[in-house]
């Protein structure tokens, strides 16, 4: 079964006014996917959104505001139909590389680069969206710290604000770094998922910090993206379990792409492999591997095709979250997805 979606679109090039300080852009997504891969909407809702509208207002030379509004055709408790994925103010200290940011944005927990329609399972496990206050430094070496009010409280923690730390090194062709998250339960997948439902607004027995590391490299026509996300300690048995023990979810993703040019037509060939560990309760597969093609035949049109094969957890595996049980099914599933993007 194929599901196709499309909605109206507005482009900044046809705007009624233009301003040097205000820029905005939009993306319209037409998606076709078999029923298996369509279920990923629940995991990474924003990836198959039908409309994304981004804007940036340069208030002064040292102050800018950014926003990204998304219209979701399949809303969830963590990503409603009209969803400000990002809306924040950023202050750059003059004559320095120090910045401050305040507002709603993705935390710097991992760096999940991808050339695919469906992003890696490491992103599913680690991406975290919060209303946060951030201080950072950005140059060849970078570091930042984010402070936020959590969605799920930990009964053993008295901290009023939780935090996220990130540091690394980058240039035009490489980005490598490590990240720390005070509570991995703040990730969107832990908050809401297809497995046991999610931890949104729940009180947890124990704190489970998260760790992420990444290495992204582009060399000539080849790109390589490697990411790893893990719980540092196991969850309490009552909060999340795997085979009758506290679960310690992990995910590893490897993606390689190669740019091909045939006369005036260029495209990317992409290969990828994802592996998860003790993540059955979250409703994501044990393994995923596949191939993809990505092309931009016109400046305003992008086309992506992806084939993947999912391997679920074995049928003797059992998991739970907040006393809701999830069983392994030992299935293999082929997934197809096609996406056209109007910019």
Name the predicted role of every residue range.
Residues 2-26, 37, 265, 301, ...:
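Outer-membrane beta-barrel biogenesis signature
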Residues 165, 328-343:
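Outer-membrane beta-barrel "beta-signal"
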Residues 262-314:
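C-terminal hydrophobic structural anchor segments
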Residues 166-280, 287, 342:
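Detector for outer-membrane/organellar transmembrane beta-barrel domains
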Residues 13-36, 40-153, 158-159, 164-178, ...:
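Outer membrane beta-barrel
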């Amino acid at each position: 079964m194929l599901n196709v979606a499309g909605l109206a679109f507005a482009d900044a090039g046809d705007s009624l006014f233009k301003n040097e300080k205000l820029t905005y852009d939009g993306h319209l997504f037409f998606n076709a996917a078999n029923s298996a891969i369509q279920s990923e909407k629940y995991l990474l809702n924003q990836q198959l959104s039908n409309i994304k509208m981004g804007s940036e207002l340069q208030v002064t030379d040292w102050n800018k505001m950014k926003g990204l509004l998304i219209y979701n055709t399949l809303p969830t408790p963590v990503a409603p139909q009209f969803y400000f994925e990002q809306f924040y103010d950023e202050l750059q200290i003059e004559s320095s590389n120090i910045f401050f940011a305040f507002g709603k944005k993705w935390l710097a927990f991992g760096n999940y680069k991808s050339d695919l329609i469906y992003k890696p399972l490491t992103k599913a496990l680690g991406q975290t969206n919060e209303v946060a206050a951030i201080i950072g430094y950005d140059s060849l070496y970078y570091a930042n710290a984010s402070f936020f009010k959590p969605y799920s409280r930990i009964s053993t923690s008295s901290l009023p604000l939780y935090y996220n730390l990130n540091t690394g090194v980058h240039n035009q062709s490489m980005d490598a770094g490590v990240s720390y998250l005070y509570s991995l339960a703040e990730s969107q997948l832990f908050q809401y998922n297809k497995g046991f439902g999610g931890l949104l607004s729940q009180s947890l027995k124990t704190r489970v910090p998260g760790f992420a590391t990444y290495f992204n490299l582009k060399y000539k026509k080849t790109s390589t993206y490697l990411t790893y996300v893990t719980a540092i300690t196991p969850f309490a048995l009552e909060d999340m379990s795997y085979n009758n023990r506290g679960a310690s979810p992990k995910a590893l993703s490897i993606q390689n792409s190669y740019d091909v040019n045939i006369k005036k037509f260029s495209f990317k060939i992409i290969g990828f492999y994802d592996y998860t560990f003790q993540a059955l309760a979250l409703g994501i597969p044990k393994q995923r591997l596949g191939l993809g093609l990505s092309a931009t035949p016109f400046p305003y049109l992008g086309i992506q095709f992806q084939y993947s094969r999912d391997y679920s957890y074995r049928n003797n595996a059992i998991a739970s979250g907040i006393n809701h049980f999830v069983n392994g099914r030992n299935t293999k599933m082929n997934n197809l997805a096609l996406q056209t993007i109007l910019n």
